[in-house]
Regions:
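Acyl-donor (CoA/ACP) binding surface of acyl/acetyltransferases
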Residues: 1-44, 74-192
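A generic local structural motif
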Residues: 8-9, 61-63
């Protein structure tokens, strides 16, 4: 895996894995983003409402200006070979907590993409934000997402009624003392 940039996360690609890149959105992503953001199979566990192409065009322009240092941001998950959009990841940092969220286009479910890119993202975040805790909110009926987080050693902290979500947490010390070695056979290269 290759990491580019520091806390800025404005350089693209930010993370490369064997099959994927995590990068800023591009205008060419709008059609695929529109398609899966309006697909019931992807949106049934999400909090967004159907979105127009005009909204997504403005969204992409705004997201490209943000950094993890001072904002929440959404990044694109794309195929490494053809740069086509596969899904997206949300990252928000506050104090010593980073919240992540993710969506993979329904056409790409069950291919291991979410595990691959989130595993790399966890390593990136814990290497760059020492002592932080990662949090993910999951709809109670979203079994694939719950299974994914548990496979990555997130632990359920219980149900948050106001959010209608199960709160999953991963502490950096837990990741750095076992999970990183267990789930990640790749070598890391950091570029600053």
């Amino acid at each position: 895996m290759l990491y580019k940039g520091g806390h800025n996360l404005k350089i693209s690609p930010i993370i490369e894995t064997d099959r994927l890149v995590l990068r800023n959105f591009k205008e060419k992503d709008i059609d695929i983003l529109y398609s899966y953001r309006n697909n019931k199979n992807c949106s049934k566990y999400q909090r967004w409402e159907n979105t127009s192409k005009e909204f997504l065009t403005n969204f992409i322009k705004e997201e490209r200006l943000k950094t993890i240092s001072n904002d929440s941001l959404q990044l694109a998950i794309a195929h490494k070979k053809n740069d086509d959009l596969v899904g997206d990841i949300f990252i928000a940092r506050k104090e010593k907590c980073i919240t992540i969220g993710y969506t993979v286009d329904f056409k790409h479910h069950r291919k291991g993409y979410a595990h691959e890119i989130i595993n790399a993202l966890i390593s990136y975040l814990f290497d760059n934000f020492k002592g932080y805790e990662l949090v993910a909110l999951v709809h109670p009926d979203n079994e694939p997402s719950k299974n994914l987080l548990e496979k990555l050693n997130f632990e359920s902290e219980g149900y948050a009624e106001k959010l209608d979500s199960i709160v999953y947490c991963l502490k950096s010390f837990k990741w750095l003392h076992g999970n990183k070695r267990k789930n990640n056979d790749d070598k890391f290269k950091f570029i600053r």
